[in-house]
A protein has these predicted regions:
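Secreted glycan hydrolases and related glycan-binding modules that recognize and/or cleave
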Residues: 1-178
């Protein structure tokens, strides 16, 4: 409800199975239910989605521009849950060791994320590696990111000004045109 009531861009479903109820097939059921309202979904038309949104949230919200285009993303520690590829805009892969393997996920849907939360005082080489990574198939990757990116605000020997490393990685992946 928060996505529609607060006009957010979408939802990030965190999948970290620890033997709890929302693991495996239960998570898949939950995610596909969310996909009725947001994200790509081969099982529903935009008209059907709009009707569901109007029934749940009313005409005022349903009439907002782009209401049927909210994103649905999975945030996970592995490249599992490939059954959810058709229902996902992106897979935020918690590749905290600096890896770049997409597994069964298409490279263009994977956003590789490093752990700045624990490693902010280091050189963050893993983030640079993820920003530089280019898939062998020539397609674009989904991007790169970091857990606790706000810690890059801190100035220290590897970070001479706030967000210096993060801005450098943005330029590596998506260079400015001068």
């Amino acid at each position: 409800d928060q996505v529609f009531l607060n006009d957010l861009d979408g939802f990030d479903a965190d999948y970290e199975p620890e033997g709890d109820f929302l693991s495996g097939s239960n998570f898949e059921y939950f995610y596909k239910h969310m996909a009725k309202y947001m994200g790509p979904n081969p099982d529903i038309t935009k008209e059907e989605r709009l009707q569901l949104i109007e029934e749940r949230y009313g005409k005022e919200i349903a009439s907002q521009e782009g209401i049927c285009d909210k994103m649905l993303n999975i945030d996970q520690t592995s490249t599992s849950m490939t059954s959810l590829i058709p229902y996902s805009n992106y897979c935020f892969l918690q590749a905290y060791g600096g890896g770049t393997g997409a597994g069964g996920w298409p490279d263009e849907k994977v956003v590789y994320c490093c752990n700045m939360g624990d490693n902010w005082q280091g050189d963050m080489q893993s983030m640079y590696n993820q920003a530089r990574y280019k898939p062998a198939n020539g397609k674009r990757k989904g991007g790169f990111g970091a857990f606790f990116i706000h810690r890059d605000y801190n100035v220290h020997e590897y970070n001479p000004e706030p967000y210096y490393r993060f801005r450098q990685c943005i330029q590596i992946q998506n260079p400015a045109i001068h």
